[in-house]
Amino acid sequence: MIKMWRLQIVLVPPSAQDIITFLEARLNTPQSVSPMVQYNEDIITHNNSINNCSDPSPTSPSSQNSIQSNRSSDFINYLPNCKKFLHFTDGDNTLLQLSNEILTKFDRLYPNFKESIEIVSLQDRHGCDLDSEFIIKDVFENDGVVLVILKDELDWSRNQHISLLQLARQRRRQDNKPSTKSIVTEKRKKISKEDLSSISNKDTMHLIAKSSLKNNFINKSRVSTPLMNEILPLASKYDALNKEKCPMPLTSTVVASNVHKDVKDHARAKEGVVTQGSDNNKENIPSSTQQQKNDGAKRAESKDLDLLRNSSEDADYEPADENSPQISFDSIDTDFQLSTTSHTNSDMHIQYSNPSSGAHSPRKSSLEIKVQNKKGDDLPLNDKDIGENCRRIEAFSDEEDFNETDNDRADSFINNSKKASMGFRDINSDLDSVSFNSDIENAVQSTQSTKNVVSPPFFPEKELNNRLHQSQGKEALFRLVEKEFPDKSLGAASSTSHAKDVKIQETIRKLNRFKPTGETKVQKRNSITEPYYGKFGIMKKDKPKSITSKGVSLETKHFDDPNTIISGEKFAKFGKIKVKRKTDDVGSKVIEFKRKRNMGNRSLKDIFANAGKPPNAASTIKVVKLMRDPVDNSKDKVEATSNSTAQEQEQVSPKLPVMNSTPGKRKNGQAIPSSLERTPQLKKVKVTRSHSSPSSSSSMSLESSLDSSSSDDSDDDSDSRNVQVKKINFKTSHGPAGNSNGKPMLDVDDNEINTKKYQTPKYVESDEDDQ
């Protein structure tokens, strides 16, 4: 079991060392000199005798040592500029370990003391210097006094008094950071035994252990909240992060460009280090000019690059430099591409793209890294590429301008144009409108316009098939660019070979921003099948129209206007093509089901409207309302009366169709009622039909049987007759329902529908005058 030693640590500055020596000399004098000390010894002896304790006599050496230690510690309390505190440690530790523990304890007890302290040596209560290899239990007794001799004075006037509550909080804050505490402890234990043994005087320990401000973990933990740690982070944290990053080779040239127009300035970073951060912490990427200065290489083309960059319409574009691998970082929305090519046509393309959202934020950005290694002085343009570019420049219309398109696909166009200007070949591009194949037919098909024809003076077909010299082809291409797109801003800079290449690159880059030809659209339309919508087909009136010279294709979604490019859900200048599909909701399905179920049934209104009329005659009767009076129990007196006579005449041409809801089952030219009682009563309804010529419309009026006497007079004057319709009783039965074709009707769940079957009613027409 480890036995802990209780020690009294006394910090003695240089000004208090002489006083301690004087006190030690006074304490070593005979005890009779001090009557007060003798009085205290008598009291201690008397108390021990009362408690029957076998304590040694006051004159024994052990008792004298304990008394003298207590006296010395009591006198030290009154020394100026001294500090005393209690410390517990293991008795088997050395004095070197004790000195490190004293420094740690001092930092914990006095956190406001900002000055660094240095321990010169450790002494016992007699003022003897001690060796650092001594064991604590061999030198000090339990509750002994350890004098810590300091190099500098302790100025306590500059430090504020700290309360116990503040001290407890400080300790809890330190306990939460064990790593910091262990680091400081290890730094203070770096003094080895060999360093101490190298001192000339081995009997005296000159322990120099500094507690500087830099290594003091108390001073490093001044920030108490996590939020302040984010606002005021330590400088060493950034140093550690920068060391973890992989440095780029010094021979590479870094070109940084940001597509967003609101970010104009490039941040600066350390040489050869490229860090990728979030949107809140912008990246520090050195520009190409700064990197060239760091490398010490002065290039003559740097002036031309700056000139062309300022005169170009794309302010963020930087042309490729020569004889050096290049790395360009472009902040482009939802695009991450890594492309590495060389002049030997070896391609490597890695692309990761996210679906573009409807609303683009200027803070959304991603990174594109393109690495290109070039071995030649000139751009790697072969003969077929030169011929292709000549065709495209000649075929380009003068009506189309080079204005930037403000849409969500503009970044991808600029991205592909830069790859074209630096000799890249896009393998898996998401836009088919930009193609850089070495095949002349494919390039011409995807880039040239249909309304212009290639002019033969520059490159006839026979000359294109032959292998042209690099310098001749590029010179002819540059002359064509100067002819088609003159630029006065170049001036004398156009005489150099590099300036000509840059001019060609700029022209090709601008040509790549426009739509493909109509032939490409037709091929895309033929390759894409018509979408199938399953159960519901496309209506004829909603089918997309075919592609015309000024139309819009449903699949390709390109427009004639070069400044209008749509993608996703955005609307273009001519609107948006939408395919309408036939949709049936629940309500319409229920209505359709009821209509099919009641297809063979007719209402009473339709029955009385068509009563006594030929089957093919045009309907001219509209029954407004039928009222039923209470029916008596007797079978002889059954009459149907209405509260008010409903009469309505309607003038309709005979050619109009019959006003029937749905065709139903008929028997002998008479319709079947839709809803009747199981045992219907006999009804008597008076129907008056007026006869007229076929050209004029006929009219029929319904009257109550009670008003028959009043209507007889009018019938005599006009050519009309009273018709009495009688309905007899009939039986009902249950069975499966059928439609007009005789097939059984099914419900939504494909089950047969059972309905009531009625016997066909018979109607008898008779004149009341005959009766």
Swiss-Prot record:
<feature type="compositionally biased region" description="Basic and acidic residues">
    <location>
        <begin position="295"/>
        <end position="307"/>
    </location>
</feature>
<feature type="compositionally biased region" description="Polar residues">
    <location>
        <begin position="640"/>
        <end position="652"/>
    </location>
</feature>
<dbReference type="GO" id="GO:0007000">
    <property type="term" value="P:nucleolus organization"/>
</dbReference>
<feature type="region of interest" description="Disordered">
    <location>
        <begin position="271"/>
        <end position="330"/>
    </location>
</feature>
<dbReference type="GO" id="GO:0000183">
    <property type="term" value="P:rDNA heterochromatin formation"/>
</dbReference>
<feature type="compositionally biased region" description="Polar residues">
    <location>
        <begin position="346"/>
        <end position="359"/>
    </location>
</feature>
<protein>
    <recommendedName>
        <fullName>Topoisomerase 1-associated factor 2</fullName>
    </recommendedName>
</protein>
<keyword id="KW-0539">Nucleus</keyword>
<feature type="region of interest" description="Disordered">
    <location>
        <begin position="346"/>
        <end position="367"/>
    </location>
</feature>
<dbReference type="InterPro" id="IPR043185">
    <property type="entry name" value="Net1/Tof2"/>
</dbReference>
<dbReference type="GO" id="GO:0070550">
    <property type="term" value="P:rDNA chromatin condensation"/>
</dbReference>
<feature type="region of interest" description="Disordered">
    <location>
        <begin position="633"/>
        <end position="771"/>
    </location>
</feature>
<dbReference type="GO" id="GO:0000182">
    <property type="term" value="F:rDNA binding"/>
</dbReference>
<dbReference type="Pfam" id="PF10407">
    <property type="entry name" value="Cytokin_check_N"/>
</dbReference>
<comment type="subunit">
    <text>Interacts with HPR1.</text>
</comment>
<keyword id="KW-0597">Phosphoprotein</keyword>
<feature type="modified residue" description="Phosphoserine">
    <location>
        <position position="397"/>
    </location>
</feature>
<feature type="modified residue" description="Phosphothreonine">
    <location>
        <position position="405"/>
    </location>
</feature>
<feature type="compositionally biased region" description="Low complexity">
    <location>
        <begin position="51"/>
        <end position="69"/>
    </location>
</feature>
<feature type="compositionally biased region" description="Polar residues">
    <location>
        <begin position="275"/>
        <end position="294"/>
    </location>
</feature>
<feature type="region of interest" description="Disordered">
    <location>
        <begin position="48"/>
        <end position="69"/>
    </location>
</feature>
<feature type="compositionally biased region" description="Low complexity">
    <location>
        <begin position="690"/>
        <end position="709"/>
    </location>
</feature>
<dbReference type="GO" id="GO:0019211">
    <property type="term" value="F:phosphatase activator activity"/>
</dbReference>
<comment type="similarity">
    <text>To yeast YJL076w.</text>
</comment>
<dbReference type="GO" id="GO:0005730">
    <property type="term" value="C:nucleolus"/>
</dbReference>
<dbReference type="InterPro" id="IPR018844">
    <property type="entry name" value="Dnt1-like_N"/>
</dbReference>
<dbReference type="GO" id="GO:0034503">
    <property type="term" value="P:protein localization to nucleolar rDNA repeats"/>
</dbReference>
<dbReference type="GO" id="GO:0005739">
    <property type="term" value="C:mitochondrion"/>
</dbReference>
